[in-house]
Design a protein with these regions (language model features):
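ABC-fold ATPase nucleotide-binding domain signature/coupling loops
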Residues: 46, 109-136, 151, 158, ...
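Conserved ABC transporter NBD signature motif
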Residues: 48-56, 65
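Conserved "ABC signature" C-loop
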Residues: 76-120, 145, 161, 218-221
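Helical segment within the ABC ATPase nucleotide-binding domain
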Residues: 163-175, 187
């Protein structure tokens, strides 16, 4: 993976995202996760081979490729318009019933019912909490019905209640879908089919949660740090 100036940002890497399964991508800040995501999206050049269903990414129309992706990021991007506009991205051929179904699947129907689909939203998500905005972003991804789901720290900015809603909606939505889940929270990855661990631009570990957690390596170190932080936070809440 290269910068526009040709500088190597990450790699060499070798892995496969299994069709219909979820792969988690973890690693410390600066490990190269963002570079990998941007490369998969077609925003960054690369050397070697990167194929999508056997077709080289360079040969694909990148705009069309991105239209097949349901994306949920760390900071939900909402547009100036109504709740309906934000979920449908302004497409007028989508029935309100479909919008409502997507909102229900994203656990957003509770607060949307209070405001209505025509509730106006500014481009800074005014009037909504971060958790509510993230659930609208999830509803948008569900309605898009992408063949590939890309989840980039989707719960990093959320409180515990909102995180529970979003993770529940995501888990239900990506069943039987091909998904890449970038996260710093390792405990929820016990049911993930494959975990990739990056450090300094390289893939240093790969496997299942149970195996990686028992091996000496970066994943076990990060997991121990995660658990210590959770225990400390629980102590603060109990105090």
């Amino acid at each position: 993976m290269l910068s526009p100036q040709g500088k190597r940002l990450a790699g060499p890497l070798s892995f496969t995202l299994q069709s219909g399964k979820t792969t988690a991508l973890v690693g410390p800040s600066g490990a190269g996760k963002t570079s990998l995501i941007n490369t998969i999206l077609g925003f960054m050049p690369y050397q070697g081979s990167l194929t999508i269903n056997g077709i080289e990414l360079r040969e694909l129309d990148h705009a069309q490729w991105r239209q097949t992706i349901s994306w949920v990021g760390q900071n939900p991007l909402l547009l100036h318009g109504t709740i309906r506009d934000n979920v449908t991205l302004g497409k007028h051929n989508i029935a309100d019933e479909q919008v409502t179904q997507a909102l229900q699947a994203a656990y957003a129907q509770e607060f949307v019912e209070q405001q209505g689909l025509d509730y106006p939203i500014s481009d800074r998500s005014a009037g909504l909490s971060v958790g509510q905005a993230q659930r609208l972003a999830l509803a948008r991804a569900i309605l898009q019905n992408g063949r590939f789901w890309l989840l980039d720290e989707p719960t990093a900015s959320l409180d515990a209640r909102s995180e529970q809603y979003v993770m529940r909606g995501l888990t239900e939505s990506i069943q039987q879908r091909t998904a890449l889940f970038v996260t710093h929270q390792l405990q929820p990855l016990q049911s993930v089919e494959q975990i990739l661990v990056m450090e300094n631009g390289l893939l240093v570990q790969a496997g299942h949660f149970e195996d990686l957690s028992q091996q000496s390596g970066l994943f076990a170190t990060m997991l121990a740090a995660n658990q210590a932080l959770q225990a400390a936070n629980k102590g603060d809440l109990d105090a």
